[in-house]
UniProtKB/Swiss-Prot annotation:
UniProt gene name: NPG4
UniProt record similarity statement: Belongs to the cathelicidin family.
The entry's keywords: Amidation, Antibiotic, Antimicrobial, Disulfide bond, Secreted, Signal
PANTHER family: CATHELICIDIN, CATHELICIDIN ANTIMICROBIAL PEPTIDE
Protein name: Protegrin-4
Described function: Microbicidal activity.
Amino acid sequence: METQRASLCLGRWSLWLLLLALVVPSASAQALSYREAVLRAVDRLNEQSSEANLYRLLELDQPPKADEDPGTPKPVSFTVKETVCPRPTRQPPELCDFKENGRVKQCVGTVTLDQIKDPLDITCNEVQGVRGGRLCYCRGWICFCVGRG
């Protein structure tokens, strides 16, 4: 009788531990990776664009230092390039080829890794040219160059 009671108690604890194990990963699964957050920003850029073709991620700058809070805005910098896919097709940009001589845009701003909050603040400017193998864009009198070179 005593062993039945102990077995029943152990079974309850096992059940609680199993439920806890199922709940904890699902809570952390709501956090995006830095790359996923940027890809979501590219999707938003394509949704809000009035241009004929979709843009696809071309280059992603280094992520900022790790921050434990997925809701804290993270600085982001990336480059997108025009693809051959027309915007109305709603095809995932990752499946589209880059357009030869397509437009290139440098994007900067902030993203969050929280799937629920999702505030984005991204500004993209068309790259003005190539200097020594690096993409350059200008805002007023100031030019920024990114990439290798």
